[in-house]
UniProtKB/Swiss-Prot annotation:
Its EC number is 6.3.2.6. It comes from Methanobrevibacter smithii (strain ATCC 35061 / DSM 861 / OCM 144 / PS). It comes from the Archaea. Pfam families: SAICAR_synt. InterPro entries: SAICAR_synt/ADE2_N (IPR028923), SAICAR_synt_PurC (IPR033934), SAICAR_synth (IPR001636), SAICAR_synthetase (IPR050089), SAICAR_synthetase_CS (IPR018236). The keyword Nucleotide-binding applies. This is Phosphoribosylaminoimidazole-succinocarboxamide synthase. NCBIfam families: purC (TIGR00081). One of its GO terms (molecular function) is ATP binding.
Length: 243
């Protein structure tokens, strides 16, 4: 399947139309950004590792009854996916308090959150992705109450499945963000990606960071080692690809 027209050139991914009106090609680039794109670097093979990690996690979710937009991975950094009408909401699930949560609220760093916090942000760079609530979502026409409830339910199910899967690999899923869209039938399914770019991942023994937070903290030389470590832990040896 060949890529045709560029329809979205994001911070780290490019999306193209294909000869199938119901499918798109998502190209994972080697770009790494922070601070709403204010800081940008290129990390060798980062796009491929993110695509491979996302593919594995999408397959795990599919095996557990959670529909995703994934179709195929013809190249290590190229994903063929179902075309979705994306909902401009980032759904964030937090299992452990850290990051922006402890900066905004009186809660100690490292506090286990039980039940997990589900947060929704407006995906809009020009407004710096402000936090939403149900009333704002409905006022902006982003989703109905029924859809808000569905997004919450799906995000918590994703959290349940991936927390267990990753812990078996010695990784704590601290928090993560996901995006959803509607397919040609109007069904809401998981889209975009799930990778160390959009998750906080800690080693379960040392609590070392294995995600993009390393880049945010200026530890550029440790970033790709962490991404490779995640890949090596979650991909069985017989499925590994030499990059």
């Amino acid at each position: 399947m060949d890529k045709k027209e560029l329809i979205n050139n994001g911070k780290v991914k490019s999306v193209y139309t294909t000869d199938d009106e119901n499918a798109v090609i998502i190209e994972f680039r080697d770009d790494m950004t922070a601070g709403d794109g204010a800081r940008k670097e290129v990390m060798n093979k980062k796009g491929s590792y993110n695509a491979l990690i996302s593919t594995k996690l999408f397959k795990v979710l599919e095996e557990n009854g959670i529909k995703t937009q994934f179709i195929d991975l013809p190249e290590t950094n190229v994903m063929v996916a179902k075309k979705l009408e994306m909902i401009p909401i980032e759904v964030i699930v937090r299992n452990i308090a850290t990051g922006s949560l402890i900066r905004k609220y009186p809660i100690a760093d490292g506090t286990k959150l039980d039940p997990p916090i589900v947060q929704m942000d407006f995906k809009a760079d020009e407004f710096h992705d402000p936090m939403l609530n149900d009333s704002i979502i409905k006022a902006l026409g982003l989703a109905t109450q029924e859809e808000i409830d569905e997004l919450t339910e799906k995000a918590l199910k994703i959290n349940e499945v991936l927390s267990e899967f990753l812990l078996e690999a010695g990784i704590i899923l601290v928090d993560f963000k996901v995006e959803f869209g509607k397919d040609k039938n109007g069904e809401i399914i998981l889209g975009d990606e799930i990778s160390p770019d959009g998750c906080r991942l800690w080693d379960s023994e040392t609590l070392d960071m294995l995600d993009k937070e390393l880049f945010r903290k200026g530890k550029d030389n440790e970033v790709m080692d962490a991404y490779v470590e995640v890949y090596n832990r979650i991909i069985p040896d017989d499925e590994k690809i030499e990059l």
